[in-house]
């Protein structure tokens, strides 16, 4: 129930999308990262929202890094100069993972993890969410599990 509440809060209140609150967790897996371990740059095409819950962090566990989609713009584009660094104009944002914390982000957002330090470990549970009903105003469709 808690994960569902976090999902709907993120999708509806944070991102501002119109959606039902009901969702499926389509995938869920445990990550145990030993010293020097990392995750390469990737996204989750099978999810509207992805997330990671940090179960145990020890030593220098390495943060999750989110890449700004604007850092690889489609051409042509208009370049601008950064006035002050924000989450919207930086090339990437450090997710600063913390034990007991759940991070949610759009599933299509490229991300990776920094390597864990010596004598460090990071244990997390990652997941992907899909809404039970997709709606685009005049039409909608339901997602079912088989």
Regions found by a protein language model. Give the residues of each.
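Short beta-strand His + acidic residue motifs that chelate non-heme Fe in jelly-roll/DSBH
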Residues: 39-42, 111-118
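Signature of the catalytic double-stranded beta-helix
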Residues: 1-37, 41-43
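A hydrophobic alpha-helix/topogenic segment detector
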Residues: 91, 118-119
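N-terminal leader/capping segments at the start of a protein or of a new domain
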Residues: 1-10, 136-146
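A short hydrophobic beta-strand segment most commonly corresponding to one strand
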Residues: 51-53, 119-135
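Residues that flank catalytic or metal-binding motifs in active/ligand-binding sites
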Residues: 26, 47-49, 60, 121, ...
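Catalytic core of non-heme Fe(II) oxygenases with the double-stranded beta-helix
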Residues: 33-104, 134-143
């Amino acid at each position: 129930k808690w994960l569902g509440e976090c999902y709907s809060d993120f999708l509806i209140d944070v991102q501002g999308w119109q959606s039902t609150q009901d969702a499926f967790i389509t995938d869920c897996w445990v990550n145990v990262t030993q010293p020097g371990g990392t995750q390469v740059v990737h996204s989750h095409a099978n999810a509207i929202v992805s997330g990671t819950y940090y179960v145990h962090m020890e030593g220098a566990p390495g943060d999750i890094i989110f890449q700004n989609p604007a850092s690889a713009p489609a051409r042509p584009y208009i370049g601008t100069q950064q006035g002050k660094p924000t989450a919207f104009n930086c090339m990437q944002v450090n997710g600063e993972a913390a034990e007991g914390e759940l991070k949610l982000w759009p599933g299509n957002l490229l991300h990776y993890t920094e390597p864990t330090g010596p004598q460090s470990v990071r244990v997390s549970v990652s997941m992907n969410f899909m809404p039970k009903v997709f709606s685009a105003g005049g039409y909608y469709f339901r997602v079912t599990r088989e």
